[in-house]
Amino acid sequence: MIRNSSPSSLLRRLARRIAGPLLLPFASQQPAARLLRSTARQQWKLLALNLGSSLVEAFSEGATLAVIFLALELLSAPSGGAVLNLGRYPSIGFPGPLQEAVAQAPRTPLFLGLLALAVLLQALMSLSAYLNQVSVGYFAARCMVSVKTLIHQRILALSYACASGYRVGDLLNYAGQGPVAINTTITALSQLLVNGLLLFTYLGVLLALSPWLLVGAAGMALLITLVQKQLLPRIRDGSQRLTVSQVRLGSRITEDIQGLRLLHSLGQLEAADRTVLGQMHELEALQRRQTRLTAAISPIARVLPVLAIAVIAALSLLAFGGRVTGVLPSLATFVLALQRMNMRMEVIAGVFTRLSNNSASIERLNEILSPAGKEFRRLGGVPFRALERGIRFEDVSLCYEPDSPPALDGVSFTLPKGHTLALVGTSGAGKSSIADLLTGLYAPTGGRILIDEQDLATLHLPSWQQRLGVVSQDTFLFNASLAENIAFGCGWATRADVQAAAARAQAAGFIAELPQGLDTLVGERGYRLSGGQRQRISLARAILRNPELLILDEATSALDSQSERLVQQAIEQFERQRTVLVIAHRLSTIVNADTILVVERGRIVEQGSHAELLGQGVAYAGLWRQQLGREQAVSG
């Protein structure tokens, strides 16, 4: 049994139902809601225009229905007596002089005047609807720019360790779907506002006509609300599952595209296709279920008003004691109002459905914008000026995960300014971890890294990173020109500076052979260049920075012998009188290093010059003999 089902209580319930989503952005402390509030404060004029146009639209519609009702009353009035007695409607409160003028007016001109007034009111309503859509469109565009900026800033603000824990597909989904989710929410809330005002306008018209009509309309609204309470939670749950499935599929496709070379090389194309096909079937099943649930809303919203019309028509006839002429204006106006209210109810039902479908995307937006569970780049600290004495590792340890074995364990060494220090060891020994610590990508879990006896943890990290030059085996180039890639991070560089850096990196020759020279676009990740050419562009970028510390992380490991020779020549010319950390792939490239560290299982097991380590005849000497034997076998 439904308790307290009076018209006033039903109206209050309906008002709370519509007002809830409208007030949520102003009450919630979630990041997306705070973003909407912040933008609303900045763009309050647009919101005022949106609210004002919504009110005018609702008023125009209500006034139109009132005019149509009066016109129908005029048509049904008896030929004798007053043409139209406005005194019969004390609840409206027509002024006395207006009542007298209308009562004495000729029937035909008065009827035509009422029709003209109805048309003017509908024109005003259309203008208000236009202003409403423009204002919400402008506001949504501003919010989309804000959320795109925030998401991009948030991803860049994460520490490298935290950001690398996300899948590429997840980050792309955050950046792509977050703005869309905000736009959907704003548009839906605007539609909920204007259609909610119109809904209450129609209910007010029905109340003025007869409380019985209002009871019928309120009962219809209650039935639709009950149906929505059954369907919307299922739609919301399905939306969340659908979003998770879409993200998984997008991540898998992204990985397949990025790993095409591996899939081709290992003959795993069919296996990858089967995996994606299975995920697509899962996604299709979820989409079908979501379609069934979503599609059920609109038919139900269409059937119930028709049932209400039949019931209320019978009630109206009973209320007027069977006098058809008395009931026709009220019934005709009611049917028109209910038909138009039905359209608004369908829109409102669709709005709630879209908000439910959009809830998972909003949750993901809140997830990336919320600081909870995230580690951010370190800001602040003492600005780094220049390297004066050198770099010292003091009992440094590093664990990538709390429960994982340490990548580095008690590492200590000194790299004086102007010296070259080389790291050698088997794959996974911890060499690149040392470079990652120096570049600030990770923070040590134990010990200290001292830059001129200043703890790196207390330095302003960007000022330190801007004085580094890094050339790694995995060179990243932007889809831009060669000149832009070389000058990346060096906004002060002139064209001549870029050309000089390219020449010192042994890149001027192949650049001159390109049709557009330095203005040649390299393609995504530099796919239009060979591996050796990409490495030389990366080296040119490092040279242009004039770094205090040059880090070479197996910079020639993936190159053929000719490309390696060119890159190695450029490196040897540039590294003179510089502080250099080299992670060596071929030991022959580091024989002139001032100090060589042999790393095994995260520890330094040997250190010394090339000659000293060969003389000891232990780990380094064994690596040297192995590599020398392989090279002789290949050449033989």
Name each model feature, range by range.
Residues 41-45, 160-161, 177-189, 237-245, ...:
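An intracellular "coupling" helix at the cytosolic face of ABC transporter transmembrane type-1 domains
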Residues 268, 292-295, 340-368:
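Cytosolic ends of transmembrane helices, especially the final helix of ABC transmembrane type-1 domains
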Residues 1-69, 74-118, 124, 131-136, ...:
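Membrane-integrated ABC transporters
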Residues 190-232, 290-332:
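A hydrophobic transmembrane-helix motif
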Residues 39-40, 136, 156-201, 258:
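Juxtamembrane loop-to-helix connectors within ABC transporter transmembrane domains
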Residues 118-125, 129, 221-222, 294-305, ...:
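Hydrophobic alpha-helical segments in the permease module
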Residues 384-636:
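ABC-type nucleotide-binding domain
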